[in-house]
Amino acid sequence: MKAAIEEAETGVREGGIPIGSVLVHRTRIIGRGHNRRIQKNSVILHGEMDALENAGRQPASVYRECVIYTTLSPCAMCSGAILLYGIPKVVIGENQTFRGEEDLLRSHGVLVEVVQDQACIRMMSNFIRANPKLWNEDIGEI
C-alpha cells in the first residue's frame, strides 16, 4: 500500500487527483500508476488503469497471480479491468470517501480487502473538500 500512496502523492504534486495503484506479481511491483485524467486530459487514466498500462503486456497467467493495491475503492471501469484480466485480489486503501464496485468484484470471486488507511482517507477527504468540481467530474457526477 505504501507504493500506491506514493503514487497518489505524485498525482497531487502533478496537479491531479490523489489516487494511486500498484500491480504486484508475487512480491514484485510490475506496474505503478496514479490518476492522470487531468494531467493527460484523459477519460480513462484512473490509478488502476495507469498501473495496468505501465505493467505492459503480460500473459494471462501473470495477472492471475497478481494483487492490485489501490488507495481508493475501484470504480466500475477499473473493476471491469480487474475482472477482465482475472486479478484475484484487490487491497483497497479506503472506501469511506467513495465506495466503488466492491460487491461486483466479490460476486466474481475476487478477494477484496479494505484497510481503511488513515493517510488514504485524509488525502482524499482533503482533495474532495478543496476540489469538489474535479472530484465530481472524476466519478461521473458532472
Which residues fall in each region the model found?
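Stable alpha-helical structural segments in soluble proteins, enriched in small hydrophobic residues
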Residues: 4, 8-11, 47, 51-55
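Mobile, glycine- and charge-enriched loop segments
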Residues: 48-72
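Zinc-dependent deaminase
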Residues: 1-11, 80-142
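Local cysteine-cluster metal-coordination motifs and their immediate loop/turn environment
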Residues: 45, 68-88
